[in-house]
Amino acid sequence: MRNEWMIAKRLYYAEGKEDKKMSLPAIRVALTAIIVGMVVMIITIFVVIGFKQEIQQKVAGFGSHIQIVNFDNNNTYEMQPISVSDSLLERISSIEDVDYVQRFATKPGMLKTDSAFQGIIFKGLPLNDSVSAGSPSGWDFFTDYLIKGHLPKAQNEVIISSTMSDLLNLQVGSAFFAYFIEEKIRSRKFTIVGIYNTCFSDYDKSFVLGDIRQVQSLNGWDEDEVSGVDVNIRDFSELDRIHDKVWMRVGNKPDERGNFLYTQDIREQNPNVFSWLELLNMNVVIIILLMVCVAGFNIISGLLILILDAVQFIGILKALGADNGFLRRIFLCRASFLVINGMLWGNVIGLILCALQYYFHVIPLDPTAYYVSYVPIAFHWGWWSVLNVGTFLVSMLILVAPSAIITRISPAKVMHFE
């Protein structure tokens, strides 16, 4: 292949000369198609990965990657209690790649002001006791999205979303009554100390965050009784493996009060959200296939023009004894320079555009429709490498068949015509 590469290189650098300028427009079109295709594919992959990570993070922030709950629960926020000891938390937090574990308790209710009311999910978290394996607690998620005030520090303090704040005209410092209905109506007075905004409207409009002891008091639970345990992990791709380990340690086993424990991961808790996210993968495949088809068509056109533009050269080499395989390899090498050049520029432009969006959030989005306020970007160098290697290999494979036109070029006819 050394001779083929050398000849292809000389032909490539001769393309700007006067006698080769007839083929330059077609080559530039093919080059542009490769560049545009690479830019679109890179942006598509990084945006989809970023969007999925944002949604996964927000869903996990309101719940967790894995939850340990009572086996008798019926998938509502009015949960049967389980007894959670410190030793149980330590057994789970000792699992590799677990970020933190924490008790939680939830209870549906109604928030009422003088002029309006709103159904809520009150989620209680410990204010100062958590067994952690890296991150202090589940409050960290809300710290990142807090836009006013601070996190709760006392038993009667809560944070609400900006959606709920606007709807009910409540601000930091406002007090309100929440009503919880069982056999009889129970009320609690809370003071708002913080307002968060995750742009995830399905959850923002419902969740009020406060002290876990409020739910324990409302339900008449003891100190060790809670709705469940949140288990957050560091790497979402390890969810199945870690879930299996959590199940092996506590799944279908009784707690200290005889309640059987059950584990469920974030996908089981939110099947609709994750089914929707899976559809995004299909969109990526469709876009990549379209870009490959468009770029492939232009690359094939460029190769054919390169061959037809060099028929005299091909005829001379055939007359000197060069076989068809040798000549096809020359032009495949020459086409590879075009592909590599286009991919290089496509990567440079695509990565620059992604970096601008990542750091400066140039393109905004409507959070009520997309759950994020700007186009999210996540750099995933594994998929980036797969994309580049795959694009190059596919581009070269689709050129093998068109290069067979060289076998139909007769040196006698070409030299006679010239």
Residues covered by each model-derived region:
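A hydrophobic alpha-helix feature that marks transmembrane segments and, especially
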Residues: I42-G50, N281-A319, L327-I330, P402-S403
